[in-house]
């Protein structure tokens, strides 16, 4: 490709609203342009990278037994009403009407559409298992689109859906897809981790996320220092603490704690060790219990894991904290003075709190706290659950090593959905006994456009993007110095351009009438892995200059060896 026939569109500076590196560099390198909030046009350079990601994903999906389809982005509301997600999905679901005032949605995902297809087209167990995938545009009406294509409203995604007669068959396909995802990210050259995950609004049972490691990642991921255990912060667990309780050392006492509204104030003003404190949080209860509120009790230095909490049967989902007026209607105290002793509502205790002794908590009287509380003696221990976020250094739940934490960008997510959608939509086939059987389902997503941004977050320097040979928009850039004044420079540049193209190598020929410094800066900004510099001075010595983008190393290559040399670099 000649730059004079190409939409290069590089920029010296990024807009002020581009915060993270990938957003800045994608704009500066001429990969994307913002059309509106969360909406981007992919320019030629960006599209070339996007297509390379798509190709690898498509190849590995087909290798794993996937069959490609293409479904409409506009979906009838009837399907979403059938599964109940019309009301459940929330503001991210963009609802539209056609000229006949019929309701539709702009698809954020395609579980309903694929299930509708399968229930019409598949009628026998002999047609299963079946794994269908597509690479398609999605739309989610994000509250705050940000970080460029990392969290855009419109994005490109590969989503796959598998259908099975039973759980055992689903688990086999799930493992195939897990392995396929690992191959995809290996081929893309990304540093990543698969982690155990929560199923979220998609539903189902087992789930894994795939995270590209990057400091700018929005997600906290947790992994063992000595085993393969890894999970996102929502799902991560620490090894359950010993259930042996230390014997009480003192009687429970009542403390005056004026102006101690927080754990930090209680610790600083009254000299209580933070690990000997607990905090009591009131949330809305589910309809499975008789009271409107339920209390969650965690250690003072721990954070509530809201996903773990709302997954409990007695807690309303989504999680909703009680207001002070709602709390005072049940307890003669407000937040900051609450605790388990004589609490008039049911409560759930975190595992770490269940093994505490001689601890302090609110007395359910304003400006009062109890000290030296002990389970069994002062208050009966009720339901015990894992309620907290893990912290660095917690023992790994596998019993091997401790937990470490890193930031990650979620680029893939796979689910064992079970019959969440097939049961709601009555999607079944005739089994071997000739009876209708509801299908079991899996779901597997990869953020194609997000992968591009994540790769840049992992591979950049002060000069721009550093693409590997797999993802680079062009493998080689030819920079001819003053070619418009030097016939032999122009002639050799044309020769290399033709020969590299004939060899199937993607090459950018910078034939602009620009200063060499601008041409070099653009090549580095775009992240092209291999640069060939042709100039009169080097030609006098029978060589050209080669520069490797990753290492920055320059070397001279004999004129007649250039093509073979480049082939070797790409091998």
From Swiss-Prot:
Can you name one GO molecular function term for this protein?
Answer: proline-tRNA ligase activity
- Please give the biological process terms from Gene Ontology that the record holds: prolyl-tRNA aminoacylation
Instruction: Write out the GO cellular component annotations.
Output: cytosol
Q: Keywords on this record?
A: Aminoacyl-tRNA synthetase, ATP-binding, Cytoplasm, Ligase, Nucleotide-binding, Protein biosynthesis
InterPro entries membership: aa-tRNA-synt_IIb, aa-tRNA-synth_II, aa-tRNA-synth_II/BPL/LPL, Anticodon-bd, Anticodon-bd_dom_sf, Pro-tRNA-ligase_IIa, Pro-tRNA-synth_IIa_bac-type, Pro-tRNA-Synthase_IIa_type1
Q: Which reaction does it catalyse?
A: tRNA(Pro) + L-proline + ATP = L-prolyl-tRNA(Pro) + AMP + diphosphate
- Major location, coarse class? cytoplasm
Q: Where in the cell is it found?
A: Cytoplasm
Q: What is its EC number?
A: 6.1.1.15
Q: What class of enzyme is it?
A: ligase
Question: What does the comment on domains in this protein's record state?
Answer: Consists of three domains: the N-terminal catalytic domain, the editing domain and the C-terminal anticodon-binding domain.
Subunit composition?
Answer: Homodimer.
- Family to which this protein belongs: Belongs to the class-II aminoacyl-tRNA synthetase family. ProS type 1 subfamily.
**Function according to Swiss-Prot or TrEMBL:** Catalyzes the attachment of proline to tRNA(Pro) in a two-step reaction: proline is first activated by ATP to form Pro-AMP and then transferred to the acceptor end of tRNA(Pro). As ProRS can inadvertently accommodate and process non-cognate amino acids such as alanine and cysteine, to avoid such errors it has two additional distinct editing activities against alanine. One activity is designated as 'pretransfer' editing and involves the tRNA(Pro)-independent hydrolysis of activated Ala-AMP.
Q: Which HAMAP family does the entry mention?
A: Pro_tRNA_synth_type1
Q: What is this protein called?
A: Proline--tRNA ligase
């Amino acid at each position: 490709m000649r730059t004079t026939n190409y939409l290069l569109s590089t920029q010296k500076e990024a807009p002020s609203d581009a915060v993270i590196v990938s957003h800045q560099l994608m704009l500066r390198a001429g990969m994307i342009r913002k059309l509106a909030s969360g909406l981007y046009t992919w320019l030629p350079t960006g599209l070339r990278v996007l297509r390379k990601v798509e190709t690898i994903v498509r190849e590995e999906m087909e290798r794993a037994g996937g069959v490609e389809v293409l479904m409409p982005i506009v979906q009838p509301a009837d399907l979403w009403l059938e599964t109940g997600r019309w009301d459940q999905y929330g503001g991210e679901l963009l609802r539209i009407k056609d000229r006949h005032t019929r309701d539709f949605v702009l698809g954020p995902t395609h579980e309903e559409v694929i299930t509708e297809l399968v229930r019409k087209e598949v009628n026998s167990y002999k047609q299963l298992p079946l794994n269908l995938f597509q690479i398609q545009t999605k739309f989610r009406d994000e509250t705050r689109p940000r970080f460029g294509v990392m969290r855009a409203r419109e994005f490109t995604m590969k989503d796959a859906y598998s259908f099975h007669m039973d759980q055992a068959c689903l688990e086999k396909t799930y493992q195939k897809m897990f392995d396929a995802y690992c191959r995809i990210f290996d081929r893309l050259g990304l540093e990543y981790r698969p982690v155990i995950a929560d199923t979220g609004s998609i539903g189902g049972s087992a789930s894994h996320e795939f995270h590209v490691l990057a400091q700018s990642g929005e997600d906290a991921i947790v992994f063992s220092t000595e085993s393969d255990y890894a999970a996102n912060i929502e799902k991560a667990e620490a090894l359950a603490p010993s259930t042996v309780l230390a014997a009480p050392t003192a009687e429970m006492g009542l403390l005056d704690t004026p102006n101690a509204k927080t754990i930090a104030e209680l610790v600083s003003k009254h000299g209580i060790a933070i690990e000997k404190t607990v905090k009591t949080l009131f949330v809305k209860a589910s309809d499975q219990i008789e009271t409107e509120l339920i209390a969650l009790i965690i250690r003072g230095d721990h954070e509530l894991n809201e996903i773990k909490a709302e997954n409990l049967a007695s807690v309303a989902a989504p999680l909703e904290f009680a207001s002070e007026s709602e709390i005072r209607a049940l307890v003669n105290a407000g937040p900051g003075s609450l605790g388990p002793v004589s609490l008039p509502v049911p409560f759930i205790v975190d595992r770490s709190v269940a093994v505490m002794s001689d601890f302090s908590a609110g007395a359910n009287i304003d400006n009062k706290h109890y000290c030296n509380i002990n389970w069994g003696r002062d208050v009966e221990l009720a339901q015990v659950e894992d309620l907290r976020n893990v912290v660095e250094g917690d023992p790994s739940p596998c019993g091997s090593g401790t937990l470490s934490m890193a930031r990650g960008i979620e680029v893939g997510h796979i689910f064992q959905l079970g019959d969440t959608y097939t049961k709601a939509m009555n999607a079944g086939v005739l089994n071997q006994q000739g009876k209708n059987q509801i299908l079991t389902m899996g779901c597997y997503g990869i953020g194609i456009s997000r992968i591009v941004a994540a790769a840049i977050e992992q591979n950049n320097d002060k000069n721009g993007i550093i693409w590997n040979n797999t993802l680079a928009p062009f493998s080689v850039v030819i920079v001819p110095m003053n070619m418009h004044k030097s016939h032999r420079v122009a002639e050799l540049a044309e020769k290399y351009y033709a020969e590299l193209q004939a060899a199937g190598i993607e090459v950018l020929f910078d034939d602009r009438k620009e200063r060499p410094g601008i041409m070099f800066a653009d090549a580095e900004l775009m992240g092209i892995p291999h640069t060939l510099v042709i100039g009169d001075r080097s030609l006098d010595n029978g060589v050209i200059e080669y520069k490797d983008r990753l290492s920055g190393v320059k070397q001279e290559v004999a004129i007649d060896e250039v093509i073979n040399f480049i082939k070797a670099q790409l091998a």
